[in-house]
Swiss-Prot record:
Source organism: Homo sapiens
Keyword ATP-binding: no
Principal subcellular localization: cytoplasm
Region named Inhibitory: 35-120
Residue positions where Phosphoserine is found in the record: S26, S128, S134, S136
Annotated spans, Disordered: 1-37, 118-147
Record protein name field: Protein phosphatase 1 regulatory subunit 14A
Family under the similarity heading: Belongs to the PP1 inhibitor family.
MF terms (GO), sorted A to Z: protein serine/threonine phosphatase inhibitor activity
Superkingdom of the source species: Eukaryota
């Protein structure tokens, strides 16, 4: 009888949900370890993007010194990364900087070089649900706007 109780106790500990959890109380220690590796990678990538964004801001301030009102609101890295070629990216950047009275060629070439080391962040910019063109961007925003 005591052996049966001991057997039940050992069996219940083995089947206990707390035993099925990995370190830190999360299910499966291997899964948690994999998640940490992913987080480290994402942090490094995000830091690189942040560095490029700071560089862009600094260079725009130099290029538009004395003409701050003409400075573009932003140069969206994800929009540039979505473009197929460097030529398209270059044209897009030139279009954004058309109001600048200073030479922008060096800035464009440096930015294109910095973009080569970056990857699009799918969570930061979602493609439009109506990418097939059935709705205008304004209609799409109105349809997907949160109440």
């Amino acid at each position: 009888m005591a052996a049966q109780r001991l057997g039940k106790r050992v069996l219940s500990k083995l089947q206990s949900p707390s035993r099925a959890r990995g370190p830190g109380g999360s299910p499966g220690g291997l899964q948690k370890r994999h998640a940490r590796v992913t987080v480290k990678y994402d942090r490094r990538e995000l830091q690189r993007r942040l560095d490029v964004e700071k560089w862009i801001d600094g260079r725009l301030e130099e290029l538009y010194r004395g003409m701050e009102a003409d400075m573009p609101d932003e140069i969206n890295i994800d929009e540039l990364l979505e473009l197929e070629s460097e030529e398209e990216r270059s044209r897009k950047i030139q279009g954004l900087l058309k109001s600048c009275g200073k030479p922008v060629e060096d800035f464009i070439q440096e930015l294109l070089a910095k973009l080569q080391g970056l990857h699009r962040q799918p969570g930061l910019r979602q493609p439009s649900p109506s990418h097939d063109g059935s709705l205008s961007p304004l209609q799409d925003r109105a349809r997907t706007a949160h109440p």
